[in-house]
């Protein structure tokens, strides 16, 4: 069965974006992207690079982890604001929204249904694992369905912002088993956790 992986960049203090929710790596962002970080993404997670980054870096690798990406409307709108109607044309791309009524790109599937039932259906289908891109609200809604966490921890703190999970996650303590870790010279750490068995 396919797994749902929340693969996300986070600060040391657990935030995925600043208080306004804008792209922390964008033109006015606060998140530095060192060369070794980019090299690690290219070699280990090429499918998670958006199309403009893949083109700029001449990345053609299919990737071995994911063939489907899920994101909420607010995360999707960050790409739209940058002129990307489908930042991941190399993946099946689902956007969860109750307010968007028409997809700006025929390759992007809009889903107004319950995210939990949709993910349970996706897990039963053949294919590679499912990448939960974010944001925090969708991650909060899917908290109980997440099988793997891959945290790209940047060596910075911001004090306030959007946390890994929104208030939509219920209080439900879970333990996770460290499966892998990579420490980059720039100070970023990639941590892979699997949900511990009950």
Model-predicted regions and their roles:
Residues 1-198:
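Enzymes that bind and transform nitrogen-containing heteroaromatic metabolites
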């Amino acid at each position: 069965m396919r797994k749902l992986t929340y693969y996300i960049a986070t600060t040391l203090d657990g935030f995925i974006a600043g208080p306004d929710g804008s792209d922390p790596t964008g033109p006015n962002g606060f998140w530095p992207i060192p060369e070794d970080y980019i090299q690690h993404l290219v070699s280990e997670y090429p499918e998670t690079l958006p199309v403009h980054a893949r083109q700029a870096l001449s990345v053609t690798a299919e990737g071995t982890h994911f063939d489907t990406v899920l994101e909420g409307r607010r995360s999707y709108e960050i790409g739209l604001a940058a002129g990307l109607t489908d930042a991941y044309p190399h993946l099946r791309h689902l956007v969860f929204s109750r307010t968007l009524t028409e997809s700006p790109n025929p390759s992007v599937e809009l889903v107004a249904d319950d995210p939990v039932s949709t993910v349970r259906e996706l897990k039963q289908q053949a294919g590679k694992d499912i990448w939960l891109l974010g944001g925090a609200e969708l991650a909060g809604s899917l908290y109980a369905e997440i099988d793997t966490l891959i945290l790209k921890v940047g060596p910075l703190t911001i004090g306030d912002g959007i946390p890994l999970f929104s208030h939509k996650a219920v209080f439900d303590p879970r333990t996770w088993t460290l499966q892998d870790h990579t420490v980059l010279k720039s100070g970023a750490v990639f941590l892979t956790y699997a949900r511990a068995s009950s």
